[in-house]
């Protein structure tokens, strides 16, 4: 069974690099306070690492 990660956006995407905005979109995050559940895969962990300064992981 694959474990799920709860990801919450805690900072705005306004003024961020296009690469960061695309990564937020890839995770399915749209606005501050938005929380999504994603599978704990290497690709998702890489996206989280790139955006660690604007996400909260539970």
Swiss-Prot record:
SUPFAM superfamilies: Ribosomal protein L30p/L7e. Pfam families: Ribosomal_L30. CDD domains: Ribosomal_L30. GO terms for molecular function: structural constituent of ribosome. InterPro entries: Ribo_uL30_ferredoxin-like_sf (IPR036919), Ribosomal_uL30_bac-type (IPR005996), Ribosomal_uL30_ferredoxin-like (IPR016082). One of its GO terms (cellular component) is cytosolic large ribosomal subunit. Transmembrane segments: none annotated. GO terms for biological process: translation. Keywords: Ribonucleoprotein, Ribosomal protein. Gene3D superfamilies: Ribosomal protein L30, ferredoxin-like fold domain. Part of the 50S ribosomal subunit. Belongs to the universal ribosomal protein uL30 family. This is Large ribosomal subunit protein uL30. It comes from Buchnera aphidicola subsp. Baizongia pistaciae (strain Bp). The lineage of its organism: Bacteria, Pseudomonadati, Pseudomonadota, Gammaproteobacteria, Enterobacterales.
